[in-house]
């Protein structure tokens, strides 16, 4: 049975990580319409929260809004109990929120750049001191994630556009994990 192959892990539910209260988000293409209205939920450490719905139901727009890329009309977002105004991906990452987007080619990586540069993009603060990049530290982190996620490439200098789709997705996941998120959002991650 599937329960035998993949036994349920006992996970301790911890502190509140994210609370969304009465969020209303404008439709991305029809500004006279809202795609989501009055959405509220809470996410705790150790929980997995799934969103489902038909195409156009607002799943992607909700995640993009929490990542600082949506048009939030009303509502509040709390991260670890503190009210936040997340208006950019940089602000989301600073608050421990990352997003693996549905469209990795347009939103997840820069194809002509190397694996190393793509993985490092969202964690420049971790691999630099006084705004000066520390290549030894960058190489350490990138090689660690290439090994952990089994990214198949001759080196970290290979352009991401030259990788298979699965390895491209692993680069995007590595980039997100290197940022040490407390909240990892995935929009159609197996696509």
Model-derived regions, located:
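Glycine-rich phosphate-binding loops of nucleotide-dependent enzymes
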Residues: 1-191
């Amino acid at each position: 049975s599937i329960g035998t192959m993949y036994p349920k892990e006992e996970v301790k539910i911890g502190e509140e990580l994210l609370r969304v209260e009465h969020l209303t988000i404008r439709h991305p293409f029809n500004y006279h319409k809202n795609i989501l209205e009055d959405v509220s939920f809470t996410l705790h450490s150790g929980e997995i929260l799934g969103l489902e719905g038909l195409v156009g139901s607002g799943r992607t727009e909700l995640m993009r809004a929490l990542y600082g890329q949506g048009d939030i009309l009303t509502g509040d977002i709390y991260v670890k109990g503190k009210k936040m105004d997340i208006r950019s991906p940089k602000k989301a990452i600073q608050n421990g929120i990352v997003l693996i987007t549905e469209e990795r080619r347009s939103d997840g990586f820069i194809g002509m750049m190397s694996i190393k540069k793509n993985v490092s993009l969202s964690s420049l603060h971790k691999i630099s001191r006084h705004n000066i990049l520390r290549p030894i530290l960058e190489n350490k982190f990138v090689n660690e994630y290439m090994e952990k996620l089994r990214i198949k490439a001759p080196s970290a200098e290979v352009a991401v556009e030259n990788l298979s789709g699965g390895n491209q997705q692993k680069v995007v996941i590595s980039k997100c994990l290197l940022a040490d998120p407390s909240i990892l959002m995935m929009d159609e991650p197996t696509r």
